[in-house]
């Protein structure tokens, strides 16, 4: 087993951050996915979905990376709104406004699949992007090495808060949806 995978599992269990050296960094996207798989195999937690970031070529070019960032959504990290988030359980996290899809049947991602209706539901979501790796270990990484490390680190998965269902998705401008966050008494939209 890869030492980095073992260290990431230990950090996940302890809700802690680890320091790594340059020799431990994954050398390729393939190695990153292998480390993530080892991480999942040792962690032995139920996978309930996937998180996929940087999906468009424009985003990838802007971030100077060579593909999307993929991680698994683990059952215990799916949180339902309304709730209070204990940030000590999601180390070094940032919030990202997202939306998520719940597929109601097996769906193959083939050309034209996006035109099928009735096989999924859409929900407002907040992702708590997290890491198990101390920022000191990341400070000098170029975008590709950072991406490979983030993939190995389960795609930066921390937790996801599922909000209200988005009805009539095809008729809604997603940019128009308001999200209210109460962070220690400070309400923002």
Predicted regions and their residues:
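Catalytic-core "active-site belt" of small-molecule-metabolizing enzymes
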Residues: 2-189
């Amino acid at each position: 087993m890869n030492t980095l995978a073992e260290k990431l599992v230990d950090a996940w269990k302890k809700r802690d951050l680890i320091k790594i050296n340059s020799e431990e960094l994954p050398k390729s996207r393939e190695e990153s996915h292998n480390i993530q798989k080892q991480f999942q195999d040792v962690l032995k937690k139920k996978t309930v979905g996937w998180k996929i970031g940087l999906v468009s070529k424009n985003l990838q070019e802007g971030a100077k990376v060579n593909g999307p960032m993929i991680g698994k959504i683990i059952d215990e990290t799916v949180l339902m709104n309304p709730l209070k988030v204990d940030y000590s359980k999601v180390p070094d996290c940032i919030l990202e406004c997202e939306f998520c899809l719940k597929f109601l049947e097996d769906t193959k991602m083939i050309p034209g699949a996006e035109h099928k209706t009735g096989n999924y539901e859409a929900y407002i979501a907040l992702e708590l992007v997290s890491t198990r790796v101390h920022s000191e270990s990341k400070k000098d990484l170029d975008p590709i090495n950072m991406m490979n490390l983030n993939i190995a680190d389960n795609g930066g998965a921390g937790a996801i808060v599922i909000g209200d269902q988005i009805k009539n998705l095809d008729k809604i401008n997603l940019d128009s949806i308001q999200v209210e966050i109460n962070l220690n008494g400070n309400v923002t939209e």
